[in-house]
Every structure is written in C-alpha cells, then in structure tokens.
Regions:
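Glycine/small-residue-rich loop that forms an oxyanion/phosphate-binding "nest" at active or ligand-binding sites
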Residues: 74-123, 127
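Generic beta-sheet signal
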Residues: 13-17, 83-91, 139, 164-168, ...
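Glycine-rich, flexible N-terminal cofactor/catalytic loop recognition
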Residues: 1-66
Length: 290
C-alpha cells in the first residue's frame, strides 16, 4: 500500500462517484451535482457513460480510464488534479474499484496528496446482500472467479471452510458452470442465492440450496442472462450425533438402509422435525467415518 502524501491544499479533489447499476432513478442528487461541476470525468467506457450524461443533461468532458490504460494514463488525471481541477471517477455501473477500474488512479492520487472523496451509491454486491436473508454482519467479497473450471474450483476450495457469507460476481455465460463447481466443492445442501439483473426489468433473486439453485438455472435459459451476483452461506462445523435426538438418529439410520443419503435426510426431517441440513451433515460425517 502506498502511503498517502501530505494533503495538497492547492490541488483539486478526485470524486469517486457511484452510478446506477440499472435503474437510473438510483443516482443521487449529490452525484449529479458533482458530475456537472467537475472539470473532467474519468470514465471506464466513454461511449457508455456519454449516454448516461446525455440522459441527465450533463456536458462535462469525458476521458477514458479503464483497465488497459489506467496505469499509463493516470498521470494525465493527476496533472489536472494538481493544477487545481476537480475530477470525477466513474465506472460503467455501480461503485468504481469494486471489480471495476480505478484502483491505480486512486492510489496515485493519494500518493500525490490529492483529496479523494467517495460519493456513495449503487453497488450490486451490497444490494444483493441486503435482500438475501443470509448473515450480513460478516462477509467476504471474492469478485469474479477464474474463467476455467480448474482455477475456479481451486479458488472455491480455498474458501470452502470460510464461516462468513461468501459473495461472488459471475458473467451470464459462465453462471451455470460456476454453480456446478460450487455444488461440487461446497456440497448441494449449502444455502445460496442468485441475484440477477438487480434493479432492472427482469430482476431475479432466487434463494435455494446449491443443488436446487443449479437445477433452477439449468432448466431455464433466461436465468443465464444478465449480470449475476452469487451469495453462498458460510461454512458451519458439522453437527455431531449428540446434537441430534436419539429418535431422529434411529429414523435416519433406518432410512439410510433403504435410500440415498439426501432423500433419507429429507424424509427423516419430515418425520422427526429435525433440520434437514443438520441430518444430512450428520449422515455425511457418519459415512465418512465408516
């Protein structure tokens, strides 16, 4: 991490401005004011952002700041800032730097003693988490997983026993493969949620155990379109047999003699009132120990 330089009072400010992820009504009045008043807007895609600016009647000049030029072109923006100009940084949608460009520019600005000002707003991962019904007091954001299955599984294995809620971004053309790998690594019973096209017309938030969520996406090609956020419940230590009543264990063991583990756990839960996922974990650990 680059240590921030002494604040340069003669320099302008770099405003890190969140923009809508779908619904244009989500932009804040403060964001619009800043975008109108700054001397320059550093945008991930100037053509995309030009349409947004046109919609709101903003005539501020745009300059490209994306992953391919950010390291080299950052000095251009720093020069303007040091000359006293205010600059806004935006991405195509949501909050800059969150799986989007901007990190190198912000780092350079702070190193040069330039005031960096966050202008909060839309963020897909926070929006999804707020509506997921999964623990939100502690969570980790893993961004986009590797494109190939081997790399993806390796990353998933590294967080398999992470107790905090897991949040991932995924591209629509890889969402099914992603869920298949999650099911293979985390197990089909792990609770998860797919948040797709947040704030847009076809917004979908579907919460199911991973096996059922994978089947849901597999059966409906419409669920393989649009921007995706996947949330997965954190790992919890397997329950011991002591945590399950002796009657529930008796029923479970009888059913395991006649049917597969998943079905036995589900039926035993219906009969005894115990939680299905607890019975499933107990049976799984029991089989591993045999």
């Amino acid at each position: 991490m680059t240590a921030p330089g002494p604040l340069n009072s003669a320099a302008g400010s770099l405003y890190v401005v969140a923009t809508p992820i779908g619904n244009l009504d989500d932009i804040s009045a403060r964001a619009l004011k800043i975008l109108r008043e700054v001397a320059l807007i550093a945008a991930e895609d100037t053509r995309h952002s030009a349409r947004l600016m046109q919609h709101f009647g903003i005539a501020t000049p745009l300059a490209a700041c994306h992953e391919h030029n950010e390291r080299d072109e950052g000095s251009r923006f720093i020069t303007r800032l040091l000359a006293g100009d205010n600059v806004a940084l935006i991405s195509d949608a949501g909050t800059p730097l969150i799986s989007d460009p901007g990190y190198h520019l912000v780092r350079q600005a702070r190193a040069a003693g330039i005031n960096v000002v966050p202008v909060p707003g839309a963020c897909a991962l926070i929006a999804a988490l707020s509506a997921a019904g999964l623990p939100s007091d502690r969570f980790i954001f893993e961004g986009f997983l590797p494109a190939k299955s081997a790399g993806r599984k390796a990353r998933l294995e590294s967080v398999k026993e992470e107790p905090r809620t897991l949040i991932f971004y995924e591209a629509p053309h890889r969402i099914l493969e992603c869920l298949q790998d999650m099911e293979a690594v985390f197990g089909g019973e792990r609770q998860a949620l797919l948040a797709r096209e947040i704030t847009k017309t076809f917004e979908t938030l579907k919460g199911l155990p991973l096996a059922e969520l994978r089947a849901f996406v597999e059966s409906d090609s419409n669920q393989q379109r649009g921007e995706c956020v996947v949330l997965v419940a954190g790992w919890s230590a397997p329950q011991s047999e002591d945590a399950v009543s002796s009657e529930a264990m008796r029923v479970l063991n009888l059913l395991l003699e006649e049917m597969p583990l998943k079905r036995a756990a589900a039926l035993a839960a219906q009969i005894t009132g115990e939680r299905k996922n607890v019975l499933y974990q107990v049976a799984l650990e029991q089989q591993k120990g045999e």
